[in-house]
Amino acid sequence: MFGARCLLRALRSCSSAPCPRHKPSAKLSVRDALGAQNASGERVKVQGWVRSVRSQKEVLFLHVNDGSSLESLQVVADSNCDSRELAFGSSVEVQGQLVKSLSKKQNVELKAEKIEVVGSCDPKDFPFKYKERPTLEYLRQFPHLRCRTNVLGSILRVRSEATAAIHSFFKDSGFVHIHTPIITSNDCEGAGELFQVEPPSKGKVPEENFFDVPAFLTVSGQLHLEVMSGAFTQVFTFGPTFRAENSQSRRHLAEFYMVEAEISFIESLQDLMQVMEGLFKSAAAAVLSSCPEDVALCHRVLAPGQKDRLEHMLKNNFLIISYTEAVEILQQASQNFTFTPEWGADLHTEHEKYLVKHCGNIPVFVVNYPLALKPFYMRDNEDGPQHTVAAVDLLVPGVGELFGGSLREERYHFLEQRLARSGLTEAYQWYLDLRRFGSVPHGGFGMGFERYLQCILGIDNIKDVIPFPRFTHSCLL
């Protein structure tokens, strides 16, 4: 099989001939080795982990993976090679010649001259077995090891590529990247679900608080981006956010990543929605182009049919309905909801999923929410009798709410009244100052990055698209 006798003769002829002085082997990633156009015996060094070992009478076959690609590199060695520690999961360094493969399953293979086991792995104790496909739920028990499986490797490569694609979208669109703080004295969402930051021993700090004011882990970088939007017309941030929500649902984490943007000199939600839709489609297209094998594995193994669902989302223009229209659609539905839809009440997950299905499983923007439902910074539409603000949520298949955004209230007196009614005037005097000194119409949005990955990959549980999930009663590692 695979021309084993020919390979054996080649290996032995190499070992029996006088050993010439070789130049040092070039270190190559598995991805680069597999993509080599000229596999003409170049001496290379590949490092990685063994995914499979197969011993024949005269030839030993290994598959080595270093995380750079889904596909592994086939290594061919003389069967006399000491293979006692070559097991699934062991780490190796292989030096040899990169040659064209005789197999139709791969273009190139590595003809080994030297195999060094860097770290052994006892397959009896290793929680994952060769050729087994453990469930994502099972893998969550091993946050320190699950990245070594094919499916988690693919998810994390997609995550990496999506991160790069999002940065590229904003850079190409002229946005300035801002590092917003992790520790803050602001509660942007006003929900009170914050993690407070304190030193381990308050007695070591003479003041009442370490920072002289209560400090928290950020729930959003929006307010800091609004500061920056007074000097830069387009800004964005991409970083961790924290919510002390007592939830173990498939859609919530205590620590997750948010993509947030603020744009100055815009006066309509349409302008904002255009950027949101562009970001969604641009990043998805980049991921499909840069790691198609990884996306295909997730779709095939975890979400059959997701490929077609994603293509459907990308080729259609996103729809737009008002909050009022959404409530009317829900009230006319034959489905029995746990939460009765009524004007003035928030939309729940069951409502969001129904609306997406009603719209043909195309992402849909819901605009103009009741003023009473939204935070103080959203722009008053001055409408009646149903008083609304210029807010927008993007609902997507399988997830529900993915984006949330609004035009910001740039008018000083409107904002002053909203803050006064909420008892926040003193705490947000600095925010009012932004409206006193060169205020402009502006708006922004936030996108939950993990939910975005769930949407494009079709993964049901948010805990499976982040390397180290943190949620109620769980902070492993």
Model-inferred region functions:
Residues 1-477:
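Class II aminoacyl-tRNA synthetase catalytic cores and aaRS-like
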